[in-house]
Amino acid sequence: MMRILVTNPAPMTCLPPWIIIDPWLQQWLAEDIGRGDWSTQGLGLQHRGQARWVAKENGVIAGLPMAARIFQLLDPSMEFQVLAGEGQAVTASTVVATMAGNLGSLLTGERVALNLVMGLSGIATMTRQYVQAIADYPTRFVDTRKTTPGLRVLEKYASRLGGAMNHRLGLDDAVMVKDNHIQAAGSITKAVQTLRQNLPYPLAIEVETSNLEEVQEAIATQVEIIMLDNMGTDTMATAVKLIRQANPLIRIEASGNVTLANLTAIASTGVDFISSSAPITRSPWLDLSMQIVRN
């Protein structure tokens, strides 16, 4: 009998409240400013000024509300107008935001704000490429827990903006029995049996498999999700057929060595999900620049 499925109730479709984010932003500003922004302070740039942010290449925007917040922490009167919505695709030379306020605050906050938005937009951009590559298939692209410590919430937020589904936000969202768990427990069967005896409440259980023998064993345990890890597409297609014939309610995830080049081949095997850490761990930053507007 299939167990009750409990999955993450709050995918990162929106940012956490400012009461949570503000300390992060203040810490990052303090890291950059140190004992003072001598370049800006030395020039006495405390009058009102204007600036705009421009995309220097095509991509997907993520994080502009946090950029606005960074500038407003430095200058509460700062006016920040977002011209590109979160998750919006933009082309090179697009003005994505304009701002007006204390010129010194604009220059002091520039690097921290740009770094944050460029990094998150890079994740959203590469994620969108992965999602679009399998748009003709029912397969969904999902992210992983391979994130920068302390930045998981923001990186998974950018991943969602790119179109991915969030996998576990943390270890408490669901149970994933990986190769080291299996090695420690003795077998897939022993691991799943022990988990079902000891879990405090019903959680979805996913088992990682690397060959057809392990797939058969995982099927017999009636887990909710079976991961096909680092399998060739021929073996993967056979595994999908075995699982569907045995129990069509079991969901199937493909993972390991996933690239843009092999995404469609993997999706064509019939898996439900394809997971990859690449958009978060390997995406280049989206190139943006701030331009001071002279009156």
Curated annotation (Swiss-Prot):
Recorded GO MF terms: nicotinate-nucleotide diphosphorylase (carboxylating) activity
Record-listed substrate binding positions: 111, 144-146, 168, 178, 208, 229, 255-257
Enzyme class: transferase
Pathway listed: Cofactor biosynthesis; NAD(+) biosynthesis; nicotinate D-ribonucleotide from quinolinate: step 1/1
GO biological processes: NAD biosynthetic process; quinolinate catabolic process
Pfam families given in the database record: QRPTase_C, QRPTase_N
This protein's UniProt keywords: Glycosyltransferase, Pyridine nucleotide biosynthesis, Transferase
InterPro entries in alphabetical order: Aldolase_TIM, NadC, NadC/ModD, Nicotinate_pribotase-like_C, Quinolinate_PRibosylTase_N_sf, Quinolinate_PRibosylTrfase_C, Quinolinate_PRibosylTrfase_N
EC numbers for this chain: 2.4.2.19
Catalysis: reaction(s): nicotinate beta-D-ribonucleotide + CO2 + diphosphate = quinolinate + 5-phospho-alpha-D-ribose 1-diphosphate + 2 H(+)
SUPFAM superfamilies named among the record's database cross-references: Nicotinate/Quinolinate PRTase C-terminal domain-like (SSF51690), Nicotinate/Quinolinate PRTase N-terminal domain-like (SSF54675)
Gene3D superfamilies: Aldolase class I, Quinolinate phosphoribosyl transferase, N-terminal domain
GO CC annotation terms, alphabetical: cytoplasm
Domain of life: Bacteria
Protein family per UniProt: Belongs to the NadC/ModD family.
Self-association and partners: Hexamer formed by 3 homodimers.
Functional summary from the UniProt entry: Involved in the catabolism of quinolinic acid (QA).
PANTHER family, A to Z: NICOTINATE-NUCLEOTIDE PYROPHOSPHORYLASE [CARBOXYLATING]
NCBIfam families xrefs: nadC
Protein name according to UniProt: Probable nicotinate-nucleotide pyrophosphorylase [carboxylating]
Organism: Synechocystis sp. (strain ATCC 27184 / PCC 6803 / Kazusa)
